[in-house]
A protein has these predicted regions:
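Short, surface-exposed ligand- or partner-binding patches at beta-edge/loop junctions that are enriched
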Residues: 210
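C-terminal accessory "lid"/substrate-recognition subdomains
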Residues: 1-189, 195, 204-206, 215-221
């Protein structure tokens, strides 16, 4: 079965996010500056993996076997977008910023008009954006939390469970009692309904992107 180029690009990005060791092969065919630039791009996606340079696929065995590097939960949580969501003010790495790679979190308490958002994503989404992931709120189904994800040129919007605030009052309070951290993002008007997208890009116009996303928002109620 043929695999679409966009699918390969998306798969590679997700593999980088979930790895503990990453091999950069054929480093003898590019300049030191290009290697440094590539490492910066990798670090914008994955903060913790050990990066090993190689030529002709020759990698020391000690870098591959019995390294004790892989830990499932650590790998699961090592993607740079997760760190940025948890610590939105602490993710600017000088190594990454040097190559004009920027990470920011777009958070809003207004829902998206789904048609406007879809039109923007399909027709005007900037190529400079490398990766996006996070919960999204839209008026077509205001009680449902959606997950929006972009990796390379592939984009997906999928259901990710109901917002807690949409539950009946008794059930809502039970969920909050069992998960008190929810109150850290709770709003008196919208509850836990919100959009919070981690956006990673290179040479992107952050202000223009924010303005375009804001133009897709609408009022609720």
């Amino acid at each position: 079965e043929d695999i679409d180029e966009d699918d390969i690009e998306s798969l590679l990005i997700q593999q980088i996010e979930f790895c503990s060791t990453l091999i950069l092969n054929k480093t003898d065919t590019v300049s030191p500056e290009q290697i440094a630039e590539l490492k910066a791009i990798v670090r914008s996606l994955q903060k913790d993996a050990v990066i090993v340079e190689a030529q002709n696929g020759e990698v020391p065995m000690e870098e591959l076997l019995d390294t004790d590097r892989f830990d499932f939960m650590r790998a699961y949580n090592s993607a740079a977008w997760i760190e940025a969501m948890e610590h939105p003010e602490e993710h600017d790495d000088p190594e990454v910023l040097e190559y004009d790679i920027e990470t920011f979190v777009y958070s809003r308490r207004k829902p998206f008009d789904l048609k406007k958002f879809t039109d923007f994503v399909e027709q005007e989404w900037p190529d400079e954006v490398i990766r996006v992931k996070g919960p999204l709120w839209q008026t077509g189904d205001p009680d449902m939390c959606y997950m929006f994800e972009q990796a390379g040129h592939q984009m997906r919007l999928m259901e990710n469970g109901l917002f807690v605030d949409s539950a009946p009052e008794g059930e809502k309070q039970k969920i909050i009692d069992e998960n008190p951290e929810i109150m850290q993002i709770w709003d008196d008007e919208t509850g836990d309904r919100m959009t919070s997208l981690c956006i990673i890009g290179r040479h992107m116009d952050k202000d223009a992107l924010i303005a375009s996303l804001d133009a897709c928002l609408t009022d609720w109620h």
